[in-house]
Amino acid sequence: MPETTPRGYPTIRRKQYHHPMQTFDALLGEAEVAHGHLCAGQILGVRMAMLGCERLGIEDPKGADRKRLVTYVEIDRCATDAIAVVTGCRLGKRALKFRDWGKMAATFVDLSTGKAIRIAALESSKQRARELYPNIENKNQQQMLAYRELPTTELFSEEWVTVPIHPREMPGYKSARIACARCGEGINYDREVLVGEETLCQACASPETRYYQPLTEK
């Protein structure tokens, strides 16, 4: 007899998806497609993200564990696309956070345990690539070969850290949508600014700090 609810309806069991972590080569192939080309940064990003998941015990970041992981990246370069591919973290899901520090580094946060690990590429890895492949003049080709085979201890530094995440920064956070008193545009996720008695968007509150400047003022 099938299981039923208290009202007699058949119980609907949701399918449990489990996709164990793919191999390095498979993930690198996906990263290459997503990024548009293969480079040393892609290899670093894939290995960095795989290591972060391994340290946190996350086996299925794009399936069963998809709500456990938040990733902070510190550079807007090739490695970030690879990290997004491996972890499944996306900016639009609020699971990928960007800090513009210009560093080849990322911090992986397990929301279920609060554990977090920051992994950074070692500058010495470039010298190790030159030592391993001195006959290859192209630096990218040299690093692509070396970064595939160097042990993680020669590629990365690892540091257990704590990452306080404000509730409004969490994936799935919902807030009221407020209209700016000046431009009328909607503001989400508590990003409004109170200036005197006006509730403004950040662009209207501090026009001099806008990343854009209008050609004609309204």
Annotate the PLM regions.
Residues Y189-V193, Y211-P214:
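Short Cys/His-rich "knuckle" micro-motifs
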Residues A34-G52:
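Conserved phosphate/anionic-ligand binding catalytic regions in large, soluble enzymes, centered on
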Residues S206-K218:
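Short metal-binding segments enriched for Cys and/or His
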Residues V195-P207:
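Cysteine-rich micro-motifs
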